[in-house]
Amino acid sequence: MPGNVVSPKVLMDLIPKLKISMQETDKNEVIKNSEQHSSVSWDPDTCENLYITLEEQIESKDTLAREQALKALLLTLDATNKRVEPYLVRLLPRVLKQVGLEKVAAVRTQASTVAEDIIKTMNPYAVKTILSHVTNSIKTSGKWMEKMCAFRLLDMLVEKAPCQMSYRLPELIPILSESMWDTRTDIKNQARKTMTSVCTLISNPDIDKFIPVLIDCIAQPEKVPETIHTLGATTFVQEVHASTLSIMVPLLYRGLNERETTIKRKSAVIIDNMCKLVEDPYIIAPFLPKLIPTLEHIKETIGDPECRSVVNRSLATLIRVGNVKEGKIPEVLNIAKPENCMETLLSILKGQELVPVSDVYLNYISCIASQLIDEKNNEVVDWDVNISPYLQPIILKADINCIIDQFRKRSISGFHSSSAESEEEEGEDLCNCEFSLAYGAKILLNRTSLNLKRGYRYGLCGPNGSGKSTLLRSIFNGQLEGFPTELKTAYVEHDIDDTESKTSVFDFIANDPSVVVKNKQEVISSLLEHSFTEDMLSIPISNLSGGWKMKLALVRAMLRQVDILLLDEPTNHLDVKNVAWLENFLTSQTHITSIIVSHDSKFLDNVVQAIIHYEHFKLKKYMGNMSKFITLVPSARSYQDISMSEIEFSFPEPGYLEGVKTKQRAICRMRDIEFQYEGTSEPQIKNVSLQVSLSSRIAVIGPNGAGKSTLIKVLCGELIPQKGEVWCHPNLRIAYVAQAAFVHLGSHENKTPSEYIQWRYRTAEDSETIDRASRQLTENDEHLMNKIFKINGTSRKIQGIHSRRKLKNSYEYECSFLVGENVGEKNERWVPLPSMNNEWLPRGELIESHSKMVAEVDMKEALKSGSFRPLVRKEIEKHCESFGLDAEIVTHSRIKGLSGGQKVKLVLAAGSWLKPHVIVLDEPTNYLDRDSLGALSKALKSFEGGVVIITHSVEFTKNLTEEVWSVQNGQMTPSGHNWVQGQGTGPRLQEQEEEDTFDALGNKIEAKKKAKKLTSSELRKKKKERMARRKKGEEVFSDEDD
């Protein structure tokens, strides 16, 4: 930039002299001798005239005139003189044109210097008006030197105005991408360098390391598939801005148009994960016209259903984030357009006493304001500093600060909602922090804030998998960014760690270093005060029921001196009495803050003072209890009424049971059952009789420790009663989901749900049932199996039972034998007989001595009657989809990464794989969110088989169950039952047509249809037809119709 800056009046006089003064010394002498040097003010009218003159001179056909005009223009450049900037920008396209057209190197160099100095003097917030000229040269100029100069100007702008330029990337990157394919090598190389420079403005740590690869993909599209694979393993946790989308969307668009389905799918997954982190619909709006039609085309044409579901999910995310309504993509925000700012400015200046000024000047001010609006900058200081220098020369009397403030408020108002600030609670702040939270490759919360007050009770609500438990664990483990480390917390989750299962109840409390009471008597008193009996203090925790385990964990948390109680599903397993006890404790605490995760809406209604709700990766606080929250957020009405759930589950059809003609007929029966655990003083259940049919809808209720779970385990064969009889239909299939549902998944956490189901049913039977007590041989069983049968005059013992067939109203079984030699003597021995000597024995003869072997054969026949399902990925995904688990979770996520609710859904799906006739659920409401509870309730209601449920949730069972088994002190009292002998009444069940069957690899087995036997009249008709054909001389065979 020159050292001497000359006023407009002086320059107007100097320009004719500069035309004939070729030497620099002559030029300086003219300037030096001018009496008016720097004495005339830069008023807008003089500036306007000066730059009109310079514009004419620059476009003159006279080379000398152009050079002198450029020299004169260089003299006007002054970074401190803001009022000349609008006119300099107006001349920039002409200056750039001279770089490309001028054949005289001196003039070309002069033009290039002027262009660069214009960039140096510009206000950084004026990038919009500058860029329009620079990018126009790149797009339209046919002169390569002009383009090269434009690229250099972009590099300078990146250094001068990095923040402002980052907002312009969506416009810049497509232009630079096109230039990277220019036929001229110089342009191509410079475009790549400028692209690399521009991309340094992308501030997103998630993709920083991939930017060089993303630039490579623009120049080398063959690298797109590999880059998509690499990005597919990236965890997106940072908020996504327009600059990030500007470099990612071109790659993803190409990925969606690749031929390989896997690349299309991964591109859709990345779009879904990344766009969830876009907070403003206007950020994503410019990219929607490219992405949405492409995804819709893939959805309509792709053959892979799993890929289609991923594409659907991505589409749903784009529609939600982009605020697309009725298929109409919203227009890009126009509030920040310079012409709109100009209109606002003119309306404010109307009626003011102004110096006459051109639209060029006002447009420059509008472009600065437009950039401030783009950045959502509402700071008074920034508006004053960047607008005031340009308004001051043209406003004569009015208060400039007042005008600028009015301009700011009216311009920025479109970004701010008129709604009132959300209500805040009063009191001492425990924490007020901002953080992001992720689990594995999944973003849970993005730059959200958490404010907690002392003594308040907060309900933490959100759907399964949103990250509620992860947030509580992160707080407890001190892993939450910005959370005060000095705060003491206690975390109570769904179950006590297995490592402490052998610890006694007393030691569990006394050995905890965080517990305040250390005196033995104080520990005992505290436990007795909370309803534990003296007998319970010495028993191991593993002997406690689920409800008492939860209560023990809660008592320990209460006895710690903590600031915050973190309760994860605290009402799980608790009966009504203990839920009331917990409510009373929590509401009585004025010093302890509680954060509670629970799907029990009544409990939350009675306890919490505010709801913290997961909404689009943010935590939003609503003051009041659950009922008030529902009124504020009507979309969450399923929290209060599970029947309002909009999602659906479905259980598979159970299939036909041989001999069962109506749904009232008993398919499972218990008579005078008694069971007692080893080491206990009295039976857990006694004198229990019951029966279950296909129409059963049974709720098992009772206080904690009454024996409900024990009763169910005996019914399902998990436990063997010491007295009484348990009978089940030979072909009966029961799905049992235990109270501690996660026990099914314990050793499979590194498998995907699909792999777990494949493992569980790899032999066609349920591997989880192999270790059931009803299938284990005891010493007594082995003694009974030594029974000797007299067959065909020989003494025989049964070696194995292999198959079964119908025998009147029962069955008979094919048995292989050992034949006895010298039976009863010292040298007695038993020799296996060949299979040709197998015999069929009736069920009645075998059941007393070989009941468990008979049961094994019955179970295999039951599996056959259920029809084998292909144990392949697509079938498993389809089955799990019926329980709210999408293919992404089933096939591509490990079990250890699933939430509690998702694990329960998986256990339900896995348990029902064999199409059970009876579903037995022990506390199914634990961990499931409200929508899932509603879906499960409706699915059980429409299920064609029997249902037995243990639950303390009256809300869940009130419209579902008709029969109640009330368990108190080991005694069961049934009510509402309709037990019948024989078939009973009601519609007759018909055996359904056989479904398609498959082998283990999923190949369909074509069943051969049995030839239909012809009637005597049909045989006579066939015979006549043959004789008629023989008369005609045709060759006919009598057996051709057989």
UniProtKB/Swiss-Prot annotation:
Domain ABC transporter: 425-642, 668-994
Top enzyme class: hydrolase
Subcellular location: Cytoplasm
GO CC term (a single one): cytoplasm
GO function terms (MF aspect): ATP binding; ATP hydrolysis activity; RNA binding; translation elongation factor activity
InterPro entries: AAA+_ATPase, ABC_transporter-like_ATP-bd, ABC_transporter-like_CS, ABCF_EF3_subfamily, ARM-like, ARM-type_fold, eEF3_ABC2_chromodomain-like, eEF3_chromodomain-like_sf
Residue sites binding ADP per the record: 704, 923, 926, 952
Protein family (similarity comment): Belongs to the ABC transporter superfamily. ABCF family. EF3 subfamily.
Protein name, as recorded: Elongation factor 3
Organism expressing this protein natively: Pneumocystis carinii
